[in-house]
């Protein structure tokens, strides 16, 4: 099964990396809820300071007009969602936003461009942007789509730290969500990213009418990447009018928390990011996610083109929960 053997480079699997079959991951999902969260908390505390939360800001630097048909995405040119197309922004505008993000406590600045994949001329400008943002002392992450040969090396040379390229969903569910690319296309780009020496940010979306077994398949696919991703964003579907998944069945909040917990247990050393969908989550649900091992959030009122909790609200929630922004000093217990 594809989800069970997903090496993204030629490195021999490290003996300390546990192999996760879909059945084994599914069994984790079926663990009694509080027991599962408790186990995830124990794993989390072995590798991270449970009070430290990595704050990241995500900015859309090229918006809309994407030729892909991802059923969840309001930036697809195939759907009428009201998103206004915007060409690649100027360096100065992006740097100004990055400075604001840093002043507000973000340690990581993520940039997203709605392309199937960048062209060589796009990479020239993107590398200029990365250099400028990196000079501010921020960690940098980019999500620009499928990469051609040599592009990952160019991004690395410019100073990019992480490349985000999500698997989105389980291999078995992939064709139900996306028809313009294959699951293997994602793995190919991830391989190029690893070969270039970049860190990998790779996660998925839940709540897209997948079954629990397919959620287990997504987590197994991520956990069996070799090496495991340094950063794993777990997104809850944001239903946008005009997209095919606008009427997707609502996912129970406990199932989302289970997904966070299972991600933490199977990928103990990865950052598990509580990503899209937080604006629809209660404070109590977010608190359970942090208890279950989430230790990173996107900080700012927008995630590309969808809403995110306001920064003041996040600061208040973190204060209520006695959480603090991650720094080099408080990273570990």
Swiss-Prot record:
GO aspect biological process, one term: biotin biosynthetic process
UniProt cross-references to CDD domains, sorted A to Z: Radical_SAM
SMART domains: BATS (SM00876), Elp3 (SM00729)
Transmembrane segments: none
Chain ranges of the Radical SAM core domain: 51-278
Binding positions ([2Fe-2S] cluster): 110, 141, 201, 273
Gene3D superfamilies: Aldolase class I
Organism domain of life: Bacteria
Annotated residues for binding of [4Fe-4S] cluster: 66, 70, 73
InterPro entries: Aldolase_TIM, BATS_dom, Biotin_synth/BioAB, Biotin_synthase, Elp3/MiaA/NifB-like_rSAM, rSAM
GO MF annotation: an example: iron ion binding
EC number: 2.8.1.6
Entry keyword set: 2Fe-2S, 4Fe-4S, Biotin biosynthesis, Iron, Iron-sulfur, Metal-binding, S-adenosyl-L-methionine, Transferase
Catalytic function, reaction form: (4R,5S)-dethiobiotin + (sulfur carrier)-SH + 2 reduced [2Fe-2S]-[ferredoxin] + 2 S-adenosyl-L-methionine = (sulfur carrier)-H + biotin + 2 5'-deoxyadenosine + 2 L-methionine + 2 oxidized [2Fe-2S]-[ferredoxin]
Cofactor dependency: [4Fe-4S] cluster; [2Fe-2S] cluster
Cofactor note: Binds 1 [4Fe-4S] cluster. The cluster is coordinated with 3 cysteines and an exchangeable S-adenosyl-L-methionine. Binds 1 [2Fe-2S] cluster. The cluster is coordinated with 3 cysteines and 1 arginine.
Keyword presence, Metal-binding: yes
Pathway: Cofactor biosynthesis; biotin biosynthesis; biotin from 7,8-diaminononanoate: step 2/2
Subunit composition and interactions: Homodimer.
Function description: Catalyzes the conversion of dethiobiotin (DTB) to biotin by the insertion of a sulfur atom into dethiobiotin via a radical-based mechanism.
Family of the protein in this entry: Belongs to the radical SAM superfamily. Biotin synthase family.
Protein name as annotated: Biotin synthase
